Amino acid sequence: MIIDFHTHMFPDKIAGRTLDYLSGIFGASPFADGTYTGLCNSMGKGAVDISIALPAVTKVSQVASINRFASAYTEGPVISFGGIHPECENYKEILKEIKNLGLKGIKLHPDYQDMYFDNIRYERIIDAASELGLITVVHAGVDPKCPEDVHCTPKMARKVLDDVKPEKLVLAHMGGNEMWDDVERYLVGQNVYFDTGVILNTMPQEQFLRIVHMHGAD
């Protein structure tokens, strides 16, 4: 079975303009049209059995609608995680609702949420999510939106690991996009997962293999 653990999709009515915005930031064309149907078609072409869809909540006001959309995809070929913003004061209630909706985890994106990952607000969310058995996925390392101001560095992630000791934390992009020397320094061997999203064309192959060998693979 092939699982693509890092994908994105949006409601049909906003998918087009959302992709236009993101394509401008990334300077690249998307593989699909940003919809559920487009993602499924792309999965078929790549022989992918299951995709995990990861939403990015950029405003507190988006939380309810994003999680409502995500709740329609708790099983089948596309499994969506929920989302939360670090400025949500009622984060415990939101996380319980995410759990009750049948969602298996949450996605955090410090760059788009304009907060550094070692902020106590993130630590509280991750701790509460861990207590509920939810997986937490975090964008880690350089993002084209603000490449000179990284909001989740491997060093920040290590602090969160030491402070919170979460059971199911996933750092996207092999622990820190374009910061893989620091991934080796601070994160390899720790109780944390890495995904391989958007790194295979930029990460040195020998370093990728070394990290996989040293950290382990599931």
PLM regions: where:
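Active-site phosphate/pyrophosphate- and oxyanion-stabilizing loops and adjacent acidic/basic residues
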Residues: R68-A72, R158-K159, E184, L209-R210
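H/E-rich (His + Asp/Glu) clusters that bind or coordinate divalent metals
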Residues: M174-D218
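Divalent metal-binding pocket/active-site signature
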Residues: T58-S61, P86-E89, L101-E184
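Short, glycine/acidic-enriched loop or turn micro-motifs at the edges of active sites
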Residues: T7-M9, V142, G176, V198
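Short helix-capping segments at alpha-helix termini
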Residues: E75-P77, D163-E167, V188-N191, H215-G216
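Hydrophobic beta-strand segments of well-ordered beta-sheets in folded domains
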Residues: D49-S51, I135-T136, K168-L169, V192-F194, ...
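Mid-domain alpha/beta scaffold segments of enzyme catalytic cores
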Residues: M1-R124, A128, Y186, Y193-D195, ...
